Amino acid sequence: KDGSVFLGEITNREGIPNPGHPDHLQKQRILLRIGNRDLYGFDFKWVGEDEIAKREQPKDAYFVERREYGALIGVPVAVKEGDLTLAADSAAARQALPGLIEKAEADRHAVETIEKHEIGDINYRIEKARLEARRLDLVARNEPGRDLSRERAALETTTAEQQALFQAKTVELSTLMEKAGTSFVSFRTAEGGSKELRSLDIYRAYPANELGWFGRLGVYSGRLWEFVSGNPRESNTEGGIFPAIFGTVMMVILMSIVVVPLGVLAALYLREYAKQGALVRTVRIAVNNLAGVPSIVFGVFGLGFFVYFVGGGIDRLFFPEALPTPTFGTGGILWASLTLALLTVPVVIVASEEALAAVPRSMREASLAMGATKFQTILRVVLPAAAPGILTGLILAMARGAGEVAPLMLTGVVKLAPELPLDGFFPFAHLDRKFMHLGFHIYDVGFQSPNVEAAKPMVYTTTIFLLIIVVLLNLTAIIVRNKLREKYKTGAF
């Protein structure tokens, strides 16, 4: 009613209580996502329904997902390729926009391939050559009489080749960026202003008011695939969560590889070998009490022992050429996995002890009567029969480990990891690298984001996906457990 015009989508609706009668609503208001944060300074606005004079659903309005500043909502009015105008009105611009976005996606993929893979690989080799040269300097200092000229010459040749390749790829990238950055789309905003976007910055654009059921399904399918397989952007509030998914799954797998042997060996000793007495009872009580220790305490222990003590020692022994830059002496996925293994090992110990105790005495005696040693009996009879119960402990450990965040904040998780812990360079699994985690991603996006309203969908969707991953990991272990249970089925189970 004041003459303001807004173009956006309704994301929420709530009532405003009457100050005199709190139980009665005075009026209703709606939350509009108007986008265009670079123009307005905000992209969400509350509007009272009694203040609205007229509502329309313009068919030519587009919702544009772009590289930065959130969504842009407007009407395409022109398309330019350098100095050439390809479309000078709204109808022509709408017709040219899909092809332009498709071309921009191909150009963006080519740019990312050169930046992240080709130039990234070259930088990796140059850095390895630099560290090797540094190592040779240390060797020459410790062994003055040793001839290292051949190794130095080979390194200089390798570095020169990689530097030349780097320069060539940089020129290729600049040429591609210059060529791809000449296409622009002009949009008219609700108040009549104009905003020009480079086509390379547009990820998705669609006429929201013209979409039918299949059109909406196509948009949601594209967003879902981008969410699962893409990298985050715009302070993690948009894009995908693939690095967080990968980091979470890899951390849980590493944790499981460590926690199962530790837990089973401890349970075997307590149940099969240790003399039952006051000391063993005390140890069992201590193990049970470990499950109640706050997780942040384990994080502090992991930081002090694994990261600083063990990791620092590894750096001094095996990576002196990289110092003072730490390799293992800083947070990484290995230390995070070991910390969570310590956190969850009491669960595996208790479950494994119960499973070992449930194996019938008759099975042990029959094995011993056949001439088997105690070790053979445990290995061939007791452990297979107790495997379903041990896997139950693993399931509980994975469920707890996948959702922990506090210890990871101290031992290796980061807001954005430029590299995955697994790649094509030897030794392929780089356990010293930092990683992203779905739990920390939820915390970061939900509570550290500069745009809370825009981050809400990412928070809820990531939470659901974390639950799905935990369920899938647990289902896998449950299927294996059930198969083992059927194989070694006895009256004790």
Model-identified regions with their sequence ranges:
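Membrane-topology segments of multi-pass transport proteins
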Residues: 1-236, 492-493
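Membrane-embedded alpha-helices of multi-pass transport/permease systems
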Residues: 261-266, 297-300, 335, 342-363, ...
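Membrane-interfacial helix termini and adjacent extracytoplasmic/periplasmic loops
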Residues: 220-239, 274, 298-342, 412-414, ...
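Transmembrane alpha-helices
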Residues: 349-353, 359-360, 374-412
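Transmembrane-helix boundary motif in ABC transporter permease subunits
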Residues: 255-287, 300, 308, 477-486
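Interhelical loop and adjacent transmembrane-helix boundary motif
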Residues: 235, 411-464
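Alpha-helical membrane-interface segments at transmembrane helix boundaries
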Residues: 229, 233, 238-250, 254, ...
